[in-house]
C-alpha cells in the first residue's frame, strides 16, 4: 500500500526537489503551502499552479498573517539585504516559521493517517536560519511523537524527512534534474520586482545562481538586470 506523506511545498527550488524525492521514494505526496503575508508571494502562486503537475495528489494552502508579528524582512517593512550571504542570522529569518509550518503539517498528517513529513531545509548552502539545522529537525520529530495521539498511543511513529539537509545547492539541483524537475517553474527570490522577476542579489538568489553555475547549466528563470552576477540565469531589460 502506498504510504502518504505531507510535503511542505513553497514553490521554490528546494521544496520542489523535496516533492520529487518523496514521489521517487514511493510516497503519495500531499503538498502543503502557506500564505503568511510574505513579500515574495509569486512563489506561492507558482506552488498553486504547479503542485499537482509536480506530482502532489492534493494541495492545501493555509492562510495566516505573520505581518502582525513582523520581525523579518519577509513580513515587515525591512529592506532585504543584497550585499551577499553573511555569517550571522539575517533579517530575512522569519521567527519560528518552520516550527509553525511543521506544526500545521503534523496536524494534517495525523488526520490523513500519514506518518511521514518532508521539508526541504538545508544546512550547507543556506542563509544560517536556526530552524534549518539537523538538531532542530531531530528535536521537532521527538516533539511530534510526544504531542500526538498516534505517538502517545504507540500506533505509529512520525518521521520528519529532510533529504536535502547535507547537500550543496549544486547537489540539490543535480538530484532534481535527474528526477525530471523543471526549475523554470520555481521561484526563490526574497525581493522580486513588481512583475515577479527575481532580483538576483538577495541571499536566496545568490545561493540558487551559485548552484546552477556549479552544475554548469543556466538557471531557467529570468532575473532583473544585474542579477546574473554569480553565473547562470537570463537577464531581462
Swiss-Prot record:
Question: Which InterPro entries does the entry mention?
Answer: QueC (IPR018317), Rossmann-like_a/b/a_fold (IPR014729)
Q: Which cofactor does it need?
A: Zn(2+)
**Which reaction does this enzyme catalyse, per its entry?**
7-carboxy-7-deazaguanine + NH4(+) + ATP = 7-cyano-7-deazaguanine + ADP + phosphate + H2O + H(+)
UniProt pathway: Purine metabolism; 7-cyano-7-deazaguanine biosynthesis
What GO terms in the biological process aspect are recorded for it? queuosine biosynthetic process
Q: Which Gene3D superfamilies match?
A: HUPs
Keywords, alphabetical: ATP-binding, Ligase, Metal-binding, Nucleotide-binding, Queuosine biosynthesis, Zinc
Any note on cofactor binding?
Answer: Binds 1 zinc ion per subunit.
- Indicate which residues the UniProt annotation says bind Zn(2+): 189, 199, 202, 205
Assigned EC number: 6.3.4.20
SUPFAM superfamilies on file: Adenine nucleotide alpha hydrolases-like
Kindly give the CDD domains that the UniProt entry links to this protein: QueC-like
Residues crossing the lipid bilayer are none
Any Pfam family: QueC
Q: Which GO terms describe its molecular function?
A: ATP binding; ligase activity, forming carbon-nitrogen bonds; zinc ion binding
Which positions in this protein are listed as binding ATP?
9-19
Q: Name the family.
A: Belongs to the QueC family.
Q: In UniProt terms, what function does this protein have?
A: Catalyzes the ATP-dependent conversion of 7-carboxy-7-deazaguanine (CDG) to 7-cyano-7-deazaguanine (preQ(0)).
User: What's the protein called, per UniProt?
Assistant: 7-cyano-7-deazaguanine synthase
Organism field? Geobacter sulfurreducens (strain ATCC 51573 / DSM 12127 / PCA)
Amino acid at each position: 500500500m502506498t504510504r502518504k506523506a505531507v510535503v511542505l511545498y513553497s514553490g521554490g527550488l528546494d521544496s520542489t526537489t523535496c516533492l520529487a524525492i518523496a514521489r521517487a521514494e514511493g510516497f503519495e505526496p500531499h503538498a502543503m503551502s502557506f500564505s503568511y503575508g510574505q513579500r515574495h508571494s509569486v512563489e506561492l502562486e507558482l506552488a498553486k499552479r504547479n503542485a499537482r503537475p509536480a506530482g502532489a495528489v492534493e494541495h492545501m494552502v493555509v492562510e495566516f498573517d505573520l505581518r502582525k508579528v513582523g520581525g523579518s524582512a519577509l513580513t515587515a517593512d525591512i529592506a532585504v539585504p543584497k550585499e551577499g550571504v553573511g555569517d550571522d542570522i539575517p533579517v530575512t529569518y522569519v521567527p519560528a516559521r518552520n516550527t509553525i509550518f511543521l506544526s500545521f503539517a503534523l496536524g494534517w498528517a495525523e488526520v490523513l493517517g500519514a506518518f511521514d513529513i518532508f521539508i526541504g531545509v538545508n544546512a550547507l548552502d543556506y542563509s544560517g536560519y536556526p530552524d534549518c539545522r539537523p538538531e532542530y529537525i531531530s528535536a521537532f520529530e521527538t516533539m511530534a511523537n510526544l504531542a500526538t495521539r498516534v505517538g502517545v498511543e504507540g500506533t505509529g511513529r512520525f518521521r520528519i524527512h529532510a533529504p536535502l539537509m547535507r547537500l550543496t545547492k549544486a547537489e540539490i539541483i543535480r538530484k532534481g534534474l535527474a528526477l525530471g524537475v523543471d526549475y523554470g517553474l520555481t521561484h526563490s527570490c526574497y525581493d522580486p520586482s513588481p512583475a515577479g522577476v527575481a532580483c538576483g542579489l538577495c541571499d536566496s538568489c545568490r545561493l540558487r545562481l551559485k548552484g546552477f553555475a556549479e552544475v554548469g547549466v543556466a538557471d531557467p528563470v529570468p532575473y532583473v538586470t544585474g542579477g546574473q552576477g554569480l553565473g547562470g540565469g537570463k537577464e531581462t531589460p
